[in-house]
Regions:
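Flexible mid-to-C-terminal extensions adjoining Fe-S/redox cofactors in radical SAM and related proteins
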Residues: 1-11, 225-292
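Conserved alpha-helical substructure of the radical SAM core
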Residues: 1-105, 109-110
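Residue-level signal for mature regions of secreted extracellular proteins and peptides
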Residues: 16, 20-23, 198-201, 217, ...
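Short cysteine clusters
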Residues: 23, 27-30, 205-208, 224, ...
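Short, hydrophobic secondary-structure boundary micro-motifs
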Residues: 39, 155, 252-253
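Residues within well-ordered alpha-helical secondary structure of globular protein domains
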Residues: 54-57, 82-85, 172-175, 227, ...
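Radical SAM enzyme [4Fe-4S]-AdoMet core and its adjacent flexible, acidic
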Residues: 105-238, 242-243
Length: 292
């Protein structure tokens, strides 16, 4: 197998670790089709620790724990500690439905930040999307608590329903003290796929794999959690460095339609909501409504 050398400009600096497919919610647009019946997959806690060590050796600067709901994995806090001990920042992408009191001390550690999804300023609309009654009140309360504690937080709002109160949700978040807010449309991937259609690469931002890499609960490596059908290897069989230097990785990047404007994409362009934060490749990708 030949080795492909990736330029330092596009080499992954962020690794998305989808540590579980389990989630208390079952959002109607979830790209990973996560839910209460999801599992932690084939990867063990030791496997995840090894991937984090590989990421550190490759000079990556951030690990994102995502799911599913990452806090449903029994080792999530240990994985946060592992990354921080190796000098890598951590983002925990949580639905903020259930936060145990003791978890706040983990989330408040230096080098850790939070991300979550929000859908409406009305409980009935928010809960219709998450399919879990009470999720609006619990997520809203935990957002307020994260802000109170000074934990860095970004929130993604996805437009799922016709006439959804996206603007009102943004204003409510701003009133709570949230300063980083992104909005996006639903991507037709995963649970939101159109009936009878296969995965469509034009639903991606066009820069998947450029600055980031994802590892799924199976150990499979893809350019992004959104492009999960573009499997380039498995960390249970090969090291991350070997996979990123392999032909399958290069072929996967080539299979993704390029951005319309040809400009570079921020390596932080990773899921900011259950259906991602990059605009589709057929549009000007990453042209987001993003309040700094």
């Amino acid at each position: 197998m030949s080795t492909v050398v990736e330029s330092t400009a596009t080499a992954p600096k962020v690794v998305e670790l989808e540590i579980t497919g389990a989630c208390q919610l079952q959002c109607t647009q979830c790209f990973a089709e996560s839910g209460p019946h999801g599992t932690h997959g084939a990867m063990t806690a030791d496997d995840w620790r090894r991937v984090i060590s590989d990421a550190a050796a490759l000079g990556m600067r951030e690990v994102q724990l995502i799911g599913g709901e990452p806090t449903m994995h029994p080792a999530w806090a240990e994985l946060v500690d592992r990354a921080l001990c190796l000098g890598i920042g951590v983002e925990v992408y949580s639905n903020l439905f259930h936060i145990k009191p003791g978890w706040w001390s983990v989330l408040a550690r230096e080098g850790v930040k939070l991300a979550t999804s929000y859908y409406s300023d009305r409980a009935e609309e928010h809960d219709a999307i998450t399919t879990r009654p009470g999720s609006y009140e619990r997520t809203r309360a935990h957002i307020a608590e994260a802000v109170r504690r000074g934990i860095p937080l970004r929130v993604g709002i996805v437009s799922v329903l016709r006439g959804q109160r996206v603007a009102e949700a943004r204003r409510e978040l701003e009133a709570l003290g949230v300063t980083q807010i992104r909005t996006d449309r639903t991507r037709h991937l995963g649970r939101a796929s159109l009936p009878g259609t296969e995965a469509d690469a034009t639903e991606l931002c066009g820069r998947c794999g450029h600055g980031q890499v994802a590892v799924l609960p199976s150990g499979e490596v893809t350019p992004c959690v959104m492009s999960r059908w573009l499997v380039t290897g498995n960390v249970r069989k090969s090291g991350l460095a070997a996979i990123l230097g392999g032909e399958s990785w290069a072929e996967a990047l080539h299979a993704i339609p390029a951005r319309a404007d040809g400009n570079s994409c921020d390596p932080d362009c990773k899921p900011a909501s259950d259906s991602g934060d990059c605009s589709p490749a057929e549009r000007d990708a990453c042209d987001l409504k993003y309040d700094e």
